[in-house]
């Protein structure tokens, strides 16, 4: 998910290099998230991340540069990747509810180390919009090849 704050060009370069070196079709988590958002016609987003405020702000800027509006964002403030997996289901659920209050077109859980896939599936009806989990999106991206 690093392309979400480094910029999408990073993933595009990576994919291009991998395909040139291996001749194997290649995808990425963030590009798959964007594909799903486009397929949904979602432009107003709720963004859930485990990151620090500066990283969350960069994600917001990058998505706004792509024409999305970040209607609401919630971040846990962590800076160690291994800690992201220890964020409780209750905390993730509360973050989802917080951003859902802004009535976005879709919610993105942006970090493959956050255990959000089951909650995303379970909470879509509760919050009234699609929830895209980055780990689940990764599996979808690779299933396309």
Residue ranges and their predicted role:
Residues 1-145:
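Non-catalytic structural scaffold of enzyme domains
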């Amino acid at each position: 998910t690093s392309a979400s704050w480094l910029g999408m060009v990073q993933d595009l370069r990576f994919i291009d290099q991998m395909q040139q070196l291996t001749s194997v079709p290649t995808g990425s988590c963030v590009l798959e998230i964007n594909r799903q958002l486009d397929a949904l016609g979602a432009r107003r987003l709720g963004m859930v991340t485990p990151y620090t405020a500066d990283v969350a702000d960069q994600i917001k800027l990058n998505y706004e540069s792509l024409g999305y509006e970040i209607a609401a964002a919630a971040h846990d403030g962590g800076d160690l990747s291994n800690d992201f997996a220890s964020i409780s289901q209750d905390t993730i659920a509360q973050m989802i509810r917080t951003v859902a209050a802004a009535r976005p077109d879709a919610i993105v859980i942006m970090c493959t180390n956050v255990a959000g896939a089951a909650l995303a599936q379970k909470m879509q009806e509760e919050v009234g919009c699609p929830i895209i989990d980055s780990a689940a999106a990764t599996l979808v991206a690779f299933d396309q090849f």
